[in-house]
Regions:
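Structural preference for beta-strand elements that scaffold enzyme active sites
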Residues: 15-17, 38, 162, 185, ...
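Single conserved hydrophobic/aromatic residue that forms the stacking wall/gate
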Residues: 1-10
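Short acidic loop-to-helix transition motifs that present clustered carboxylates
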Residues: 22-26, 191-196
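Active-site C-terminal subdomain of aminotransferase-like
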Residues: 45-124
Length: 231
């Protein structure tokens, strides 16, 4: 019988490395839930400094890694450190404090406040996400990539509050400009092999919209009205 990737890692004493930069702005991150040993995180995508980090499940893992710093060759994390700007590093703490304060909690350790805040943020954004997907999918001229059409067959319902869509017969730049003129900032989806395979170029491109902690139900309704005026 075939083995799942995680089972192969356990059998061969290998480690699983996951880049969680895409989900970290929306959900609390837990090693056990993800089945990972090392997590990669781009702090810039969280609104922080342009730094990235690798987070290890257990400090004993450092013993198996070669040193990057010839001066520090011990068993700890110091041997893996590379020089970074102190100014950039100084922005990490305030970023965490900001995320920990989103839910308004002021008591408990920063770790506890961060967990409480991210749990609340995840629940709130999930409600906004459900409305965004539900209302946008009711517009007959709108195609949500990976959600409607053949490519969505068998797709998971566990989604982030971010989607890419196209409006039939309307170039993506026109959609983008109409949204921007109405106070809605989105992004033109870049050309990638995956999007090309999904037929994005054939329909005139697509637009990506992502929700954040300061978005409201009114924002979702406003976006739907503007898109409906095009569709």
């Amino acid at each position: 019988a075939s083995l799942a990737p995680s089972e192969m890692c356990i059998r061969d004493s290998a480690w699983t490395l996951l880049d969680v930069s895409a989900i970290a702005p929306y959900r609390p991150i837990n090693f056990d839930d993800l089945g990972a040993d090392i997590l990669g995180l781009d702090l810039g995508l969280l609104g922080g400094p342009q730094l990235a980090a690798l987070v290890f499940r257990d400090t004993r893992m450092f013993r198996r890694l070669d040193a990057l710093d010839p001066v520090h060759t011990g068993k700890g994390a110091r041997k893996l450190e590379t020089p970074i700007s102190s100014g950039l590093a100084g922005g990490v703490g305030p970023l965490v404090d900001h995320l920990a304060a989103l839910a308004g909690g002021e008591s408990g350790s920063r770790r506890k406040r961060l967990r409480t805040s991210m749990d609340a943020l995840s629940a709130y954004l999930e409600e906004l996400r459900a409305d965004l997907y539900s209302f946008l999918s009711t517009l007959p001229a709108v195609h949500i990539l990976g959600v409607t059409g053949e490519a969505a067959a068998g797709a998971s319902d566990d989604r982030l509050p971010r989607l890419t869509f196209a409006v039939k017969g309307v170039p993506a730049e026109t959609v983008y400009k109409r949204l921007f003129d109405n106070g809605l900032v989105t992004t033109l989806a870049p050309q990638t092999p995956l999007l090309t395979e999904m037929g994005v170029e054939e329909i005139g491109g697509a637009v990506t919209v992502a929700l954040g902690p300061f978005n409201t139900y009114h924002d979702v309704e406003h976006l739907i009205r503007v898109v409906a005026s095009l569709a």
